[in-house]
Structure formats: structure tokens, C-alpha cells
A protein has these predicted regions:
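Radical SAM enzyme [4Fe-4S]-AdoMet core and its adjacent flexible, acidic
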Residues: 57-184, 188-192, 208
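C-terminal accessory region of radical SAM enzymes
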Residues: 144-173, 200-245
């Protein structure tokens, strides 16, 4: 988790920044301990996304250690530790799903209810590993395990029909936002000082817009990459999207995927999971709203 570096950065940044600081963190959860919690509270972290890759056997296969340690149980215990010592931090358990482990999500939901019963500020949500249409992956064995647009929507709806809640089922979406990639004030850095506009491509230097020098100044600006990421993914410049009835409630889809499609020959499906299934989502929304109203009247 680079806890000492997080604290060092906060100390230096807060010394020159007088306005409030709001921080979030994405982590495997393995390295959370009392010292990590202390630093997380100090730097003002308000939410933590902790990733699971399935039930115990599956997760320990993906996130395995040579020692054979039960990584899954350690992560679950660390979630409890974080919630005990910093109950104000909102924890979201993100479950990476493919066709190989999708059947484990309901099991994880049951474990979540059993293990975290009575606790506040802990949630769970599926995260779909999508077929991004990579041209070099047409014959990959892994391709058949990935979700496409239709399969993702059907899985979300199936969960709802079976009584499992998820952020995807909320209709309409509770907020509208724009991706940070097109915000000229948003930036991320890798350990070597390379700068990126998108979290998803951190570490892939082809997407770096520049690099910090020894004085902390951003240099070697790649104007082509920067302009593509700031302006090359405008949904309203896409003729098909500009005529689509789902715009703007779809938020335009993922900009980096649009950039891959436009400039790199990608075949990403950037459409909302509502598309083609709006009536199904609306029926669930109306049924749940009526149930809530009926419960309130009792």
C-alpha cells in the first residue's frame, strides 16, 4: 500500500494546500493493518475500494502467495479491522467477475451478509471483466470468459430477479458525472513519475502525457496523447451517438475506450448496460418503488 509514501505526500501537500482534502483509495486489502488505518484516517480517506476475485478458493488462486497463506481470509479480516477502527470510511467490496466465477457472486453476497451483519458503511458490488474487442485476442482462450454488453445486462437483471441488489440496478442513476480524463485538472502518476490522465492505463507509458523531473516539474509533454485524451473522445462528435436516444443519460461511455476505437482500431462497446434493456430495468425500478411505498405505509 506504500503507507509511508502516502503519509509523506499528504504532509507535503497539506503544508501548501489550505483547502479541505478528500481522498479515496483502491487496494487489495491485504496490507491493511493498524498503522495503515491510522494513516488512512490522517489523510482523510473517505472511501476504500477493496477487490475480491471470487470465493476463497478462486481468490486465493488469483492472489496467491508462495507461502500458501489464506489471502482471502486475511482480506476479510482486514475489512473488519478497518471498519472497527475507522467506521466513518465507506468500504466497497468490488468483485471482479468473468464467466468462470460469476456463479460465486451470490455466494459472496451471502457471506457478506453473514460476516458483516450489523456493520455500517460496507457494501458489495459486481465488476465485470469485459470483452474489449482487442484485435490481438480473437483466438485467446480468455476471450470466452469475458462478458459482452448483452451478457452483462442479462446478469445484472438476473441478480435483481433473484433478490440481489447492486449499484447497476438503480434507475435512474443517482448522479451524472464526467470522466476525469477530460478534466484538465485531473492527473495521476506512476512510481517513476510518468503522468497519466486515466487510471486504467497507469504504467503503460504509451499513454503517458509527460514525466516529472527531479524538481517536480512536469516535462516531456506528449501533446498528441494529451490532446487525444482531452478532446478526442467527445461523444457529441460521434455521429451514431449524437443521434442515440440514450445520450446523455449514458454519460457517453468510457473515454479511453473511445480513444482506443478511434485511434487504435479498437472495438469496444461503449454503450450503457441499459441499452436494449430499458423496459426491464424500469419494471424492476417500479416494482421496488411500490414495495418501498407499501412498506412505508405499514
Amino acid at each position: 500500500m506504500a503507507v509511508p509514501q502516502i503519509e509523506e505526500f499528504y504532509d507535503k501537500f497539506s503544508a501548501v494546500w489550505e483547502k479541505p482534502i478528500n481522498s479515496n483509495i483502491i487496494t487489495t486489502g491485504y496490507h491493511i493493518n493498524e498503522e495503515a488505518v491510522r494513516v488512512m484516517k490522517k489523510v482523510g480517506i473517505t472511501s476504500a475500494q477493496i477487490t475480491l476475485d471470487g470465493m476463497k478458493e478462486t481468490h486465493n488462486t488469483v492472489k496467491h502467495l508462495p507461502s500458501g497463506e489464506d489471502v482471502f481470509e486475511r482480506v476479510i479480516s482486514n475489512i473488519e479491522l478497518l471498519n472497527d477502527q475507522a467506521p466513518e470510511i465507506n468500504i466497497v467490496i468490488r468483485v471482479n467477475l468473468t464467466h468462470e466465477n460469476k456463479h460465486e457472486y451470490p455466494q459472496l453476497c451471502s457471506l457478506y451478509v453473514e460476516r458483516f451483519k450489523g456493520r455500517k458503511n460496507i457494501g458489495i458490488a459486481p465488476a465485470f471483466v469485459l470483452d474489449r474487442g482487442a484485435s490481438n485476442c480473437d483466438k485467446c482462450e480468455i476471450k470466452s470468459t469475458l462478458f459482452n454488453h448483452k451478457e452483462r445486462s442479462e446478469f445484472i437483471l438476473d441478480l435483481a430477479y433473484r433478490g440481489f441488489n447492486s449499484p447497476f440496478i438503480r434507475y435512474p442513476e443517482p448522479f451524472f458525472n464526467e470522466c476525469a480524463i477530460r478534466n484538465d485538472m485531473a492527473i495521476a502518476f506512476d512510481p517513476e513519475g510518468y503522468a497519466y490522465k486515466c487510471w486504467e492505463v497507469i504504467g503503460n507509458k504509451e499513454y503517458a502525457i509527460g514525466k516529472l523531473n527531479d524538481d517536480g516539474i512536469l516535462t516531456d509533454i506528449n501533446q498528441t496523447v494529451l490532446n487525444r485524451q482531452l478532446y478526442g473522445a467527445d461523444t457529441f462528435d460521434d455521429p451514431a451517438c449524437s443521434k442515440c436516444k440514450y445520450l446523455p443519460i449514458c454519460n457517453g461511455g468510457c473515454p479511453i475506450q473511445r480513444i482506443e476505437n478511434k485511434f487504435e482500431g479498437g472495438h469496444n462497446d461503449c454503450c450503457t448496460y441499459y441499452k436494449g434493456f430499458t423496459s426491464d430495468f424500469l419494471k424492476i425500478h417500479i416494482a421496488r418503488k411500490k414495495a418501498q411505498e407499501a412498506a412505508t405505509e405499514k
